[in-house]
Amino acid sequence: MGQTGKKSEKGAVCWRKRVKSEYMRLRQLKRFRRADEVKSMFNTNRQKIMERTEILNQEWKQRRIQPVHIMTTVSSLRGTRECFVTSDLDFPKQVIPLKTLTAVASMPIMYSWSPLQQNFMVEDETVLHNIPYMGDEVLDQDGTFIEELIKNYDGKVHGDRECGFINDEIFVELVNALAQYSDYEDDEDGEDNQDDERDDITKDQDDNMEEKETLPLRKFPSDKIFEAISSVFPDKGTSEELKEKYKELTEQQLPGALPPECTPNIDGSNAKSVQREQSLHSFHTLFCRRCFKYDCFLHPFHATPNTYKRKNNEAANDGKLCGPYCYQLLEGAREFAAALTAEIIKTPPKRPSGRRRGRLPNNSSRPSTPTVNVLEAKDTDSDREAGTETGGESNDKEEEEKKDETDSSSEANSRCQTPIKMKPNIEPPENVEWSGAEASLFRVLIGTYYDNFCAIARLISTKTCRQVYEFRVKESSIIAPVIAEDVDTPPRKKKRKHRLWAAHCRKIQLKKDGSSNHVYNYQPCDHPRQPCDSSCPCVIAQNFCEKFCQCSSDCQNRFPGCRCKAQCNTKQCPCYLAVRECDPDLCLTCGAADHWDSKNVSCKNCSIQRGSKKHLLLAPSDVAGWGIYIKDPVQKNEFISEYCGEIISQDEADRRGKVYDKYMCSFLFNLNNDFVVDATRKGNKIRFANHSLNPNCYAKVMMVNGDHRIGIFAKRAIQTGEELFFDYRYSQADALKYVGIEREMEIP
């Protein structure tokens, strides 16, 4: 046992040495390849320049040389001096005027920044990308600043530990290179011949490195390789994680391989029949249900499956026939569709004879599958025709009335019209084959349109409603039921007013509470079938439940909006009192949802979300650096602009702020207790507004559709051409340190 332990320990040490040596060799080989690529590109560009130069030389040889005008005197020119240019060759002396330029004031220093019109959330930078240059004076005054800055990033500096860098490409090459040892190594005497094998393997790899990299591996690499890599690079994960990563990377390199969790294009030739969740995976992952954008950069969190449920039917079946061969003419079709809808929306099916609630067929949780047979429908029709011939005049009239009703319903119901119009005497084909694209599209639509097979057939456009119905019956035991959210009954008007008043009093109480000054970021709560009590994230953060929360619409913690009929610019408005903008989905009487494309809106408490900013001008300031000026006059409390930038965490703001303090220039603005807006790298023009103890503007953090946003408003009436100032809320020492000049008092 002791010898076995020593042998395994010695083998692990040997594998670590192999990992280090192969890693250094691959890094050196990569540098050589990079140098060869740069050299090749340089030679190619050089050759192109030489060819172009030769063409220009040939053109110049064919042109006529124009004589140069030689000035004799410049004394008549004002503000110039006469200069002579002489040459040692036999060229005549030239007279050149020397013009004197007047002194021009230099422009203020401006660091590069990227303009944007809305906030942009970024991740924390855990690695210092570059050591900022502060000048020799700053380093002489504070020699430990750089050391403290590096400590804030846990000593991680980009490019400092180059030997510890490993990307996906080097990782795959390293595993492939180490796999060669397993092929040559023998379990019994492998340790005794390591040096000889190392020389042979290295020689073979140097000769045929490129060929071996392109060849597929015969067998999966040994676990010893991943254990050795994990021991050398512990921050890259465990051996099992590295093994899974290697499988994923090698599978992506195979020809025709698709990315993970990728479904083939539904319109392509390789379309597959997949379930609804797989077809909508990209939509659910990339779509933001708060700003209704794909790949949102403001809300990086992913929605939970509870947000995928629909609260109502997109197009309920109204019972009208779409044509002479509508699926509703089949026996048991209407009952099956009603039971299906009742199961999905959790409401019992309505019987045609009354309003009593009934159970699902067969007392089961899933709707019963009726016996669908086109031949039976055909026999039934023929029996009806035979009965009509012998039934007398009354039966003839009833048949004509049914026919007229069917024709009128098919003409009136244009929404459910089936795209394939069948002739009266042609039976629909049986055993129709469904392609993968059609089956996948059907499973997607069934979760939206439920029992409206006519609408589904119209969207598929290659199948009739009867074929869609028959396919749904066949898959009734395969498709998982789409459970919708419970249908909420709207409360009575008196209760609604009571909740509005209770919410209004609750907002006032929060304003009076000292702890309400701590504003936290809003995250939608998601606790299905649980009330918003003390365990609700919104209640804990002292935030109201918004329309994005998964709680019930009659939740006591929900903000109900306002019912104002004025401009919503006084504390009489609940939204204005709660420092919120009016929500167009909640505030329906103040005009927040009207005239969305127009600036003339009655509600004055929705300027940030509408982007109703003023025209700003950028110019040098008399106070410090650059300043921002207003082009048009602005009234008191009128919205000017939103302060936009990068949304960073408080920890990231502390790290960046230490650098900004040395530059004596900061664009950090506290958004809430969790995040800060930094307009240093990205922002809009309002970032150039300077600080003043007597400002003409003020900043206000408002809740806008679930997001905290910073609005800049006029503190008084501002005339055209005035520079904009607002209070940075510096301490007295910081104000003297960063802003040495205070603007003169202006009489409004």
From Swiss-Prot:
SMART domains: CXC, SANT, SET
Main location: nucleus
Biased composition regions of type Basic residues, renumbered to the chain: 348-359
Species name: Xenopus laevis
Keyword match Transferase: yes
Homology family: Belongs to the class V-like SAM-binding methyltransferase superfamily. Histone-lysine methyltransferase family. EZ subfamily.
Keyword Transferase: yes
Alphabetical keyword list: Biological rhythms, Chromatin regulator, Methyltransferase, Nucleus, Repressor, S-adenosyl-L-methionine, Transcription, Transcription regulation, Transferase
Domain (SET): residue spans on this chain: 614-729
E.C. code: 2.1.1.356
Compositional bias segments (type: Basic and acidic residues): 200-215, 376-387
Domain CXC as annotated: residue spans: 505-607
UniProt feature, compositional bias: Acidic residues: 183-199
Annotated InterPro entries: CXC_dom (IPR026489), EZH1/2-like (IPR045318), EZH1/2_MCSS (IPR048358), EZH1/EZH2 (IPR021654), EZH2_SET (IPR044439), PRC2_HTH_1 (IPR041343), Pre-SET_CXC (IPR041355), SANT/Myb (IPR001005)
Gene3D superfamilies: SET domain
Protein name: Histone-lysine N-methyltransferase EZH2
